Amino acid sequence: MRYFVIGTMIALAGLLVGGGVGSYFTSSKLLKQFQNIPGSPIVLSATYNKEKHLIAYTISNPGTLPIKITEKAFVFTPGKESKEKGYVLSNIPANVTIPPLSVAIVELKLKEGTEKLKVGDLVVATFTYTHPLSQDIYTVVHPFTYGVKEKQQTEKKEEKKEESK
């Protein structure tokens, strides 16, 4: 009986030490692999600045590698209230580097000499970016319709007030 208990104790100790060493090596390799996964930029918000005639995009980098936004472009499509004609601006240099796990603001200046945005105007922005692990070029497209969400939210609030009366 004594040899059985000693043998069982040695076997359990071996399993614990082996499991601990194995999980350490596995987790360290897995952690290194996850650290090298580039994130794709996420546009968190877009706001129009009337005075400067630009749209400021808040862009997040959820990855563990820096992302460099090299170019930006956009297509302007007028809404019902706008007198402006549609236009496209492309190949606008950006050179904005977003560090890992952080947020940056990228400004997109609208065409000079054009009128300010009206409710319903659509600006579809394209951001071209790269990351250090590849020579490939990636893009993110974000549509921004001026004033529509604000107008819808105001209408919803008014409807709720009427329903509560």
Curated annotation (Swiss-Prot):
Its main location: membrane. It is a single-pass membrane protein. Keywords: Membrane, Transmembrane, Transmembrane helix. The keyword Transmembrane applies. The chain crosses the membrane at residues 4-26. It is found in: Membrane. This is Uncharacterized protein aq_758. One of its GO terms (cellular component) is membrane.
